[in-house]
Amino acid sequence: CKAIRVENGHATVVPELCVLCGRCVTHCPAHAKHVRDDLTKTKQLFNLGKKVFASLAPSFASEFSDYTTEELCAALKLLGFYAVSETAIGADIVSCEMAKQLEEATTKNQDSLKSKLFLSSACPATVEYIRHQLPEFSEYITDCASPLLAHARYIKETFGKDCSVVFIGPCIAKKREADIFP
């Protein structure tokens, strides 16, 4: 990882180079790097009496394979979530938007490279990698929201802007994405 530097025997992460891939967490021999824990923030949202929705990553099925979807959703509601919805709904929204953008681009600019190259914005770590390591390709990143952001917007449009959305999934990069686009 190009963002990890060793200075005076200690590894540090250079924020300007970090693409949020999580390699520093998995490769640190001293186990000094950790994924940020947002349990306190989530509990604060519950305590404020807000409607808090869980946006559940599709990977939940492999992480909680001993439980049915219904059991997991019921457990999350017992913890205080108002409702549970799969982030995959956001992926459907993004797929439709991508198809529309692709059709528009190919109709307007059939001979241009822009009509032939589309880089998905679905993965915030990939987007950061392109912006930091391959900036010449940044213009080809679609302006679609990521599935997480599309899902959060859908929930807020459906249930009101005053509700909160908490992403539950394994992706470190989505934590920063949620910070940038609350």
Regions found by a protein language model. Give the residues of each.
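Iron-sulfur-associated redox domains of electron-transfer enzymes in respiratory
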Residues: 36-182
